[in-house]
Amino acid sequence: LADPDSDLLSNADESRLGTDPFAFNLQTGHFVHDTWNRIYHYTVEDLRQSDDFYGEPTKSTMIAVDQVKDYSSYSGHRLRAHFTPTASGPHRFWLSARTSAQLWISEDDTPFRKRLHAQLSPNLGTGHGVQYRSRNLWDVFASQRSGEIELQAGRKYLVEVIAQHGHGGFSHVSLAWAPPGGEREPVPADLFGTLPNPADDQDDDSLPASWE
């Protein structure tokens, strides 16, 4: 279906919503979800070294923040969104996943300054992830928790989760946070929103075009 503004809403969808089909329309509470099928690996490290990961994904969709689950065996996944905190100060994040996963947060709203803040990997002794049906197990491994990250209220940051699923069911990815002075809780969905590819990275490989 036609999608000239690359916001993952077809022209038919935009007509129903009454939005401009030629201007990117942010969808609050959603990630952009890129999927690569037939990726026969078990770790994100292997996925990131695969040529397939830097090519076209099998599919790109929008997915609600609380619905990242039940994806197919032997598949790689990248979830991206802009995140806008409501308070300035130190934030902490937790990552829960059935399989190998990484949480990256950028210092701005582009992928060029992203940093790895939490992860699950067999290479860290975490097996293939939390390995449970529950999506809210935050303290199984120390590597699930980030350090304190200084963020500014109202500023957009790119958040990216990369996950590799081997085989088996009950796949899931979820995030929690502790805002300044607050307790840990699931990250509110309305702080996330879909995002376009940066103008300087239209091939979507997280490298500025000027570097290539």
Predicted regions, residues:
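Extracellular calcium-associated, cysteine-rich motifs in secreted modular proteins
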Residues: 1-29, 195-212
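Acidic/polar, compositionally biased interaction segments
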Residues: 24-204
